[in-house]
Regions:
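N-acyltransferase acceptor-side catalytic subdomain
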Residues: 1-441
Length: 441
């Protein structure tokens, strides 16, 4: 069907709203990527007296005081990590960083990722052939057709590589939560206007992964026009005070799960696990990337696709905090897992393995147990953050679901109210049963 003329579009705001909501396909989209080359970070006065904003486009230009506001040991927003992700960026990803000043003193900061979210490409189940009865197949085709035109240029306040609140930090001794969130929203709006001046027009803003129990920030964001929606829980294993060794952890299990763990260890004896240094990661770079894609390609929902050089860039930037462990069968790398030390917690980062070997060697389950052992005996942290996906098997090793909420705001007011419903409609559903290896379930 021939699209309406330009004259008609100019006379019909609703038509323009619809067109901006359904962004064009990749082939049609000729808008340039944001320009990160010029990073003079001009200071902008905000609406609150004495408060100013600096927008940086590269982590290398962030001042040293950026790290000073972070909680002790926080790595996901550190300059070291941010520089590493820029050296090996995810496909189609750009970055921006906000610094908030009050009376010339830094009182807040936010790390943003800029990407185009293409629904059909990033939700695997929509790409598959429909199954089920006639109505189920019809519903699948409707969702697929709708999703094929549901594309957004997003400012993501947070980190798509992780689950959890790695979006912003504010000094709450100088700002109350409502004031902090008002500044965050104003800063993100300033960023959107700055990007539009470069030729990259954002359709919406996503602030990701606030904990359900956090009552201050969500309320403030809703007052700013954001709508919250739950999106798959973060699986977290908190350690008990009397767990000093991995054996202590095993002894706390009920018999059924302890037997299961020992059975997995027995199956895993056919593999050799070794920590990989920078040289080994570089040597195995192709294999690591292939193994990562073996698993990432099977995930129903993927917000990003890592580049081949990501693991090496991270190891070079954070040699002590970032660790990679390889699993070998007869000197052939068949799997790997990675961890990132983040203050009082150990983050289970990306992993990969040969799916056809998983059952015989209980490869994935052994990786989970190994990360628990490392967290207890080597890193000596308080918890392991296992992130999203594979919820049931993670609960079988003791991880508990922590509800996370994302907050979204479409920059077109016509569709802002409808967006949360669309997100819930398209969200992949994972049916699972929580396990209780320590009893009480």
């Amino acid at each position: 069907m021939k699209p309406p003329s330009i004259d008609y579009a100019e006379k019909c705001p609703l038509y323009q709203s619809v067109q901006s909501f359904f962004s064009p396909s990749i082939a049609e989209d000729v808008s340039p990527s944001p320009d990160a080359s010029a990073d003079s970070a001009p200071i902008r006065a905000l609406s609150v007296a004495g408060v100013e904003l600096a927008i940086h486009r590269t982590a290398s230009n962030l001042p040293g005081l950026w790290d000073e506001l972070l909680p002790e040991g926080q790595q996901m927003m550190s300059r070291a990590y941010l520089r590493a992700q820029e050296q090996a960026p995810a496909e189609g990803m750009e970055y921006a960083y906000l610094l908030f000043y009050q009376d010339k003193q830094v009182v807040g900061q936010a790390a943003c990722q800029l990407m185009e979210f293409r629904t059909l490409r990033q939700i695997q189940s929509l790409q598959q052939a429909p199954e089920g009865n006639i109505m189920g197949r019809l519903w699948h085709r409707i969702k697929r057709a709708f999703a094929s035109r549901l594309n957004f240029k997003l400012i993501i306040c947070g980190a798509t590589q992780f689950t959890g609140q790695h979006a912003f930090v504010f000094n709450l001794t100088r700002l109350d939560p409502d004031g902090a969130m008002a500044l965050l929203d104003e800063g993100l709006q300033c960023l959107a206007r700055s990007l539009q001046a470069e030729g990259w027009r954002a359709d919406g803003i996503l602030i990701k992964d606030l904990e359900k129990g956090n009552t201050f920030f969500p309320r403030s964001l809703e007052e700013q026009g954001y709508a919250g929606f739950p999106f798959q829980p973060n699986m977290v294993l908190p350690f008990r005070p009397d767990w000093n060794t991995f054996d202590d952890y095993l002894e706390a299990m009920v018999s059924k799960y302890r037997v299961r763990a020992r059975r997995a260890f027995k199956k895993g004896k056919g593999l050799a696990a070794r920590e990989l240094n920078e040289e080994s990661i570089q040597h195995h770079q192709e294999e690591i990337y292939h193994l990562y894609n073996e698993i990432a390609g099977r995930a129903d929902f993927n917000m990003l696709s890592l580049p081949k050089g990501y693991f090496l860039a991270l190891k070079r930037a954070m040699p002590q905090q970032f660790r990679v462990f390889g699993y070998y069968r007869q000197e052939t790398l068949v799997g790997f897992c990675s961890t990132l030390s983040n203050g009082p917690e150990l983050e289970a980062h990306f992993m990969g393995f040969k799916p056809e070997l998983n059952l015989n060697y209980q490869l994935y389950l052994n990786m989970l147990y190994d990360m628990i052992r490392i967290a207890l005996e080597e890193e000596q942290v308080d918890k392991v953050v296992f992130s999203r996906t594979a919820l049931e098997i993670k609960s079988s090793v003791g991880a508990e679901p922590l509800e996370m909420y994302c907050y979204v705001r479409h920059l077109n007011p016509v569709f802002n109210r409808a967006l949360p419903g669309l997100v819930r409609w398209l969200e992949p559903k994972e049916e699972w049963q929580q396990r209780h290896p320590f009893g009480g379930g």
